[in-house]
């Protein structure tokens, strides 16, 4: 039995980062860019690869504006045309795959057509699996130059095994997302201790980690970086925008958009044993403004960390507060 779990469990609302002496005059002088794979992106944020968060039109805009993205895998027949379209535009292609037998045929077809997506994400709810490891090895054999992320996982053992199999990055988070009810349906997951799980996994990781799920505030991005994330995947906070998929719904004069989990009835198309739910999120206007605000808040975080670049956040001290940070507002 692992002894990793003797550590104290905590999550985003339980943590406050401690400021260091500032060295920049304005937050505008702080550099939020991050290298992930062979490319450098504006901020360490990626919209969740969910059908209610990302589509091809938004993927084009993100790539054109130096943001990382991962296209969802729920319309598999559109993946090859999507890769071709992105490459024709001179943009990078970033796709998701599962572990069904048909996905091996898909990888073979990519090789046959000489299509080489720059980024591939193996997107499985329980990523610490012999079948995920098998898929990692197959993709790295067939498409060795594609940057391969695998997940989702929750433990250091999983990080080690997926990295050893050939994954270039691992995605940490089992069920902490707002539209995910894995923790309620199964009793398993990182809900309530996602940030501690990230910290634990970062201690053994030799390759980048993506923190996936549980982000509720812009400051949580900085906290994720502090505890080892190279990239932060965000769902509900990047849903509900003008550019987001999903229908616009008006209720009592207020505007909402649909948002649903990747294992919900909406996504599956019929009732099965689901681990996601559908909800409405407030309409938020343009995603450009939200991403700009995230960058500005991250620049402020870098200033508080006493640095000029993103990595300075990793060096700050922190406290685990006795009660969560919002108790003082009551």
UniProtKB/Swiss-Prot annotation:
Its EC number is 1.7.1.7. One of its GO terms (molecular function) is GMP reductase activity. It comes from Lactobacillus acidophilus (strain ATCC 700396 / NCK56 / N2 / NCFM). GO terms for biological process: purine nucleotide metabolic process. It is an enzyme of class 1 (oxidoreductase). It catalyses: IMP + NH4(+) + NADP(+) = GMP + NADPH + 2 H(+). The active site is at 180 (thioimidate intermediate). Belongs to the IMPDH/GMPR family. GuaC type 2 subfamily. Signal peptide: none annotated. GO terms for cellular component: cytosol; GMP reductase complex. NADP(+) binds at residues 209-232. Catalyzes the irreversible NADPH-dependent deamination of GMP to IMP. It functions in the conversion of nucleobase, nucleoside and nucleotide derivatives of G to A nucleotides, and in maintaining the intracellular balance of A and G nucleotides. Keywords: NADP, Oxidoreductase. This is GMP reductase. It comes from the Bacteria. InterPro entries: Aldolase_TIM, GMP_reductase, GuaC_type_2, IMP_DH/GMP_Rdtase_CS, IMP_DH_GMPRt.
């Amino acid at each position: 039995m692992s002894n990793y779990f003797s550590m104290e469990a905590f999550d985003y609302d339980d943590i406050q980062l401690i400021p260091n002496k500032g060295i920049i005059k304005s937050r505008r002088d702080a550099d939020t860019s991050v290298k992930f794979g062979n490319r450098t992106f504006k901020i360490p944020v990626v919209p969740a690869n969910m059908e209610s968060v990302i589509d091809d039109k938004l993927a084009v805009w993100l790539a054109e504006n130096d943001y990382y993205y991962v296209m969802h895998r729920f319309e598999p027949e559109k993946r090859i045309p999507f890769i071709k379209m992105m490459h024709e535009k001179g943009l990078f292609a970033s796709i998701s795959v599962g572990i069904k037998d048909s996905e091996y045929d898909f990888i073979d077809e990519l090789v046959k057509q000489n299509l080489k997506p720059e980024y591939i994400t193996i997107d499985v709810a329980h990523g610490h699996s012999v079948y995920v490891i098998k898929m990692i090895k197959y993709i790295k054999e067939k498409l060795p130059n594609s940057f391969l992320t695998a997940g989702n996982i929750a433990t250091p053992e999983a990080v080690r095994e997926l990295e050893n199999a050939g994954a270039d990055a691992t995605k940490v988070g089992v069920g902490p997302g707002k539209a995910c009810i894995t923790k309620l349906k199964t009793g398993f997951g990182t809900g309530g201790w996602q940030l501690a799980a990230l910290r634990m996994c970062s201690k053994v990781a030799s390759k980048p980690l993506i923190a996936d799920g549980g982000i509720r505030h812009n400051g949580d991005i900085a906290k994720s970086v502090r505890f080892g994330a190279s990239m932060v995947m965000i769902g509900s906070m990047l849903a509900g925008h003008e550019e987001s998929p999903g229908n616009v719904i008006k209720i009592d004069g207020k505007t909402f958009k649909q948002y649903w989990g990747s294992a919900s009835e909406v996504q599956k198309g019929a009732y099965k044993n689901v681990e996601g739910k559908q909800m409405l999120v407030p309409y938020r206007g343009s995603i450009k403004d939200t991403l700009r605000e995230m960058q500005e808040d991250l620049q402020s975080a870098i200033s508080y960390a006493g640095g000029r670049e993103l990595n300075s956040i990793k060096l700050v001290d922190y406290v685990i507060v006795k009660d969560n940070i919002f108790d003082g507002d009551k």
